[in-house]
Amino acid sequence: MSKLKITLKKSKIGRIEKHIRTCEALGLHKIGQSVIKEDNDAIRGMIRHIAFMVDVEEVK
């Protein structure tokens, strides 16, 4: 399976609780922080909820 590099680009301040919890579930706590996760449907769904807040890159 491929992996995804997810980077938080926008602040969680002022966002609805669902977006904040999704960021934290992905392991994103600070602006500019990146995490590498497996590319699967669950992670893709979480990214879709907060797509306006994150950048996503495929890592080989």
From Swiss-Prot:
- Keyword set, alphabetical order: Ribonucleoprotein, Ribosomal protein
What would you give as a GO molecular function for this chain, any one? structural constituent of ribosome
Keyword Ribosomal protein among UniProt keywords? yes
InterPro entries the UniProt entry points to: Ribo_uL30_ferredoxin-like_sf, Ribosomal_uL30_bac-type, Ribosomal_uL30_ferredoxin-like
According to the UniProt record, one GO cellular component term is: large ribosomal subunit
Give the protein family: Belongs to the universal ribosomal protein uL30 family.
Q: How does it assemble?
A: Part of the 50S ribosomal subunit.
Q: Which HAMAP family match?
A: Ribosomal_uL30_B
| Protein known as | Large ribosomal subunit protein uL30
Which organism's genome codes for this protein? Finegoldia magna (strain ATCC 29328 / DSM 20472 / WAL 2508) (Peptostreptococcus magnus)
Q: Which gene encodes it?
A: rpmD
